Amino acid sequence: MPIANGDSLGCAMKADIQDYTKALEILEKEYTTRDGLDVDTLLDSDKHGALTYNDFLILPGYIGFPASDVTLDTPVTKRVSLKVPLLSSPMDTVTEHNMAIHMALLGGLGVIHHNCSPEDQAEMVRKVKRYENGFILDPVVLSPKATVGEAKALKAKWGFGGFPVTENGTLRSKLVGMVTSRDIQFHTNLDDPVTAIMSTDLVTAPAGTTLAEANDVLRSSKKGKLPIVDADGNLVSLLSRSDLMKNLHYPLASKLPDSKQLICAAAIGTREEDKHRLKLLVEAGLDIVVLDSSQGNSIYQIEMIKWVKKTFPEIDVIAGNVVTREQAAALIAAGADGLRIGMGSGSACITQEVMAVGRPQAVAVRSVASFAARFGVPCIADGGIQNVGHIVKGLAMGASTVMMGGLLAGTTESPGEYFVSNEGQLVKAYRGMGSIAAMEDKKAGAGSKDSKASNAGTARYFSEKDRVLVAQGVAGSVLDRGSVTKFVPYLVAGVQHSLQDIGVKSLDELHDGVNKGIVRFEMRSASAMAEGNVHGLHSYDKKLYS
């Protein structure tokens, strides 16, 4: 090809050009370091200051596989793993039973907040555990004397129909019939006994039948429910057709391997009264308890971890929040099964501003997660997540999962209230648990004057006995995001494509690549951040997914 600047320059350039087929060989021989920075150099606070997610990028690697091959399986505690590394925060405008159910169905986990009475929180746990089951070991059972009105009330309460009727109205009593949604739907006399409408032509399976065998019987029977009975015809458990359909629609669902129930997590404080709360939650079927505190390195939390592990050894404990190795070490030594990392980085949190205490999230996650990994303790990057990129960066820093509050607060499944903003946009209420609005909420204390002593916000920020409440959070609103059934799959697909760009097929590969210096990073200047965002357009529509 002709050289524009003359033959002499062209000859000189030609003499320096090497055999292109040896590019990889020359790269390996002559370049002793990789492009970019390893994670330790990146996070050297002496050189760069403390960094958070927007301060750096991950460099691309080699793509040799489709994004669909990327798996996101990850532990959330020592004993519990998820298919998707996403959690919803235990905030009263983010996670109640509806969010917890859908996060679990989508492969993640929702942590139910505790800014409510213990009984209400236990009821939410119960709803999660009943939503999708394998063998239902504690089905709602009716007696022959129960009325049609009572059956309808139970359907309205639990959100499902199909109740077995036994002689004594209890489990392990002789099965006499089934009341289905169709039986009660158009029956007008609510005082009639259920025996007047129940179905007696039942298909059953014997006790000892495996779940796979029972599912086969249920498929072929075309019934909605399959009662499991012992040799004497006594009801011992139940299987639901609706769960078969959920299995088809939600293949990544977070379920226990034995019961096939959705995994449920809930938060509590570290006060003495929280022990009673936890007992109710465990009775309702709780799997994981999250000890909720803005500063987890306290004698209260250490003693609570030890008490929970001794009293309920089957329950996994996630402790926190922490941002330093020193904080983490005390909780790990006490027996924590997982750690929550973050202090002041949440979108509705002002702890760093008001208290001058906290740590930028990227360096906090790396410092704690790399230490906790030595003891097999998974870590949650909690706070500061605004987009898919932040999720990936939190995972790259060593977190096993990422917890989101504001990012999910605008979804249909969050308990916040919808309203129209002054600009005419549909928004949802969202507040930090350190906001005055959250700390003055009286639901946890059943409306009593001393409800501050039971409030989740005051407990989280050690403010139960304060005469003057000092806010560490704000109350506001977030734009409507639609349902998590569309938004979370978008986040998952985004993480898969990001890991594909990095050149890793799993979170284990990502962590291993970061630790070995294979996955590299680059600092970002203010100009680089501007360049990496939308620029130079007169107008644009930023639609994130379809």
UniProtKB/Swiss-Prot annotation:
Regulation: Mycophenolic acid (MPA) is a non-competitive inhibitor that prevents formation of the closed enzyme conformation by binding to the same site as the amobile flap. In contrast, mizoribine monophosphate (MZP) is a competitive inhibitor that induces the closed conformation. MPA is a potent inhibitor of mammalian IMPDHs but a poor inhibitor of the bacterial enzymes. MZP is a more potent inhibitor of bacterial IMPDH.
Extent of the signal sequence: none
GO cellular component, one term: cytoplasm
Reaction it catalyzes: IMP + NAD(+) + H2O = XMP + NADH + H(+)
Major place of residence: cytoplasm
Pfam families the UniProt entry points to: CBS, IMPDH
UniProt keyword terms in alphabetical order: CBS domain, Cytoplasm, GMP biosynthesis, Metal-binding, NAD, Oxidoreductase, Potassium, Purine biosynthesis, Repeat
Subcellular location: Cytoplasm
Subunit and interaction comment: Homotetramer.
Record protein name field: Inosine-5'-monophosphate dehydrogenase
Organism: Aspergillus fumigatus (strain ATCC MYA-4609 / CBS 101355 / FGSC A1100 / Af293) (Neosartorya fumigata)
